[in-house]
């Protein structure tokens, strides 16, 4: 059986800049842009010959704080907080979870893998916990959509 989130579990708090759907203020789902809720094959994730996601510590990029996002991802409207921000104003800084930015379960079948080898970790990925088809990984990411909230404070 697949690992699941236990009651009372605090998923790691992560941030990602994504396009906002104006109809519900939630992230736009997709796998063709770095500003969608999803992962791009061949860019963010490796897909094997069978169409499964390779478990190579790659996945959908996230940060422990929206200020840690690359300045090209932070919307320009936030330049007063992050000087030099050049991201599209059509994106918003979304957050999910509440726990520390440590390796752990984000949601059913998904885990946070923070980058290694840095004293101050400013990046990680949301990756599948086991080998799954690309479509299942995308569905698992999409299933987190309602949990994301805008946080630009």
Features from the language model and the residues they span:
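NAD-dependent ADP-ribosyltransferases
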Residues: 1-153
